[in-house]
Amino acid sequence: MEAGRPDSITREKLEVLKRHKIPRISINPQTMQQKTLDLIGRKHTVGDILRVYGMARELEFENINMDLIAGLPGETVEDVKDTLRQIEELSPDSITVHSLAVKRASRLAQMPELKEAALQEERGRQMEAMIDLAAESAARMGMKPYYLYRQKNIAGNFENVGYAKVDKAGIYNILIMEEKQSIVAVGAGASTKAVFSAAEDQLKNGQPGKEVKLEKRIERVENVKDVGQYIARIDEMIERKGELLWH
């Protein structure tokens, strides 16, 4: 489960997750360079990351993932080395190394000069070095790569890679990449996805045993994005999910 950005994680929230036996959480620093966090508009500090991670370990969470981003604006290879050094000291159970992807709604997308710099050819070579360093760091922590995916607008045409220690891989991540996992999403703007097999469709339509071509079907239900509308229409949002998943 995504525990949230470090500035939004509280002991109370972690205790709720622990009480409900959530086995794996993600605490995502992106970088351990404060100047970069400030530049890209993140509200948390390096101190927040250390505090929240320590809190999670105190509560005996035994499977913690941390997300990092290679190629953030203004960061050098030396900055990434320092970030990885700090992550190694924390020794999470898995890391996911993302190559920078400029999303339309991000602060970076609104800063053309930084966006252009992030996509330059020379920057691509630096990113390659950063990604190699991350792989070496993961190996030192006893992790191996277990999943990989690409997304739109990735600088340098690189990819995102998940590394994990033995028995700590996020199997959910693999199922998502293979489009084999249904998702129940909660919150404004969240997207619920239902993956149906041909056999499930037969049962749903009252035709068990009928020979059909084995194909899966994927359907989605989107929550409204406006928080006020989401709260006002919460019953409708729940009903729409129910119709998709259980009717």
Predicted regions and their residues:
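Residue-level signature of transmembrane alpha-helix interfaces in integral membrane proteins
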Residues: H44, T83, I87, L114, ...
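Radical SAM enzyme core and accessory elements
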Residues: G162-H247
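A general marker of short, structured functional hotspots
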Residues: I49, S94, G142-P145, D226
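A C-terminal junction/extension of Radical SAM enzymes
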Residues: A105-V186
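Conserved non-cysteine loop/helix-boundary elements of the Radical SAM core domain that shape
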Residues: M1-A134
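Glycine-rich beta-alpha junction loops
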Residues: A101, K152, A190
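Generic domain-boundary/flexible-linker signal
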Residues: T36, V77, S106, N157, ...
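Detector for Asparagine
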Residues: N28, N63-N65, N153, N157-N160, ...
